[in-house]
Curated annotation (Swiss-Prot):
Record protein name field: Lipase chaperone
Family from the record: Belongs to the lipase chaperone family.
Record's keyword terms, sorted: Cell inner membrane, Cell membrane, Chaperone, Lipid degradation, Lipid metabolism, Membrane, Transmembrane, Transmembrane helix
Gene: lifO
Pfam families in the cross-refs: Lipase_chap
Entry's localization field: Cell inner membrane
Amino acid sequence: MSKFFSLSLVAVVVAGGLTLYWRWPAAVPEAQPATTVAVPSRQSLIEQASTSPAKAPAEAQPSIAVTLPSLAGTEVDGQLRTDAAGNLLLDLAVRDYFDYFLSAVDHSGLDAVIEALLADAGRRLPEPALGQMISLLGDYLDYKRASMALMQQPLDARQQVEPQAQLQALQSAFARLDELRRAHFSATAQEALFGAEQAYARYTLDSLAVQQRDDLGEAQRTQLLEQLRERLPDALRESEQRQQLAQEQLQRSEQLWRDGADEQQVREFLAMTYDPDTVQRLLDEQRRERDWQQHYQAYRNELASLQGRGLSEADGEQLQRQLRERLFSSEDRHRVETYDAIAAKQPEPLDP
């Protein structure tokens, strides 16, 4: 069991790492065929802006909720600011502002999103900042268009189950994204929009590489990881340290469950660090995870008994698909497939 879950943990870490990069657009549901989003070019964006009233009265402009219903009831994320000379200030808040509107693409379409974004920005920014924002948005959309092909490339069979291959795939994706960003943005804009993300992504990949080295003792590995952590910007380092402490607390609480502790004992342990609402949320999450693992193990047991009937490979694969569809929701099946792929590479069966 431990070997299986150690590998599955790597898969989860890798999947989590990918979310550092993939922020556009929302995933296409399984039941729908994948389609290509037509991202407008910088020139067409400028033309669209020039045909829209830049400073129409507020009452003449439809609200964001009307134009983009999926954003109803939400606050505009990010911020558009100017310096004393009226120039656009570049920081992560500008990217957050873009992404807030772009999150509605799947629901409302890109044309409506761009129209709403330009109308909102026109009420917030004077010139020359407005023109600078439009130019930057054009670069951002061009970058998104160029990066979509990279995002859509699936992992091959080896990359799905081998940690070293997964790490190499992530390193390659990171390098290619970095090249795309350098090609589409000035050095100043790249640092402002992606600097923190790139620093943490580089730290994550370097940490995974250290963890996979078998020529290091535990003390050497700990020292190298600490050196990597020290290179992070202060804010990221403090955040990472908080995450590490939280992860250690959760691991200790999970060990309590494995050692036979009851819920009250785990609650008391977590209460030494977290407030009551957070303790309850963590207990609920751990309970759901234990239930899911038990459900998955029951599925594996039923699958093993069915596969013991001497079915052909094709019949066995069809039976496995049918069993997944019967026992798991569509949201859970990707996780089941990942676990199954890992289990298929293990020489020993999973412990019940």
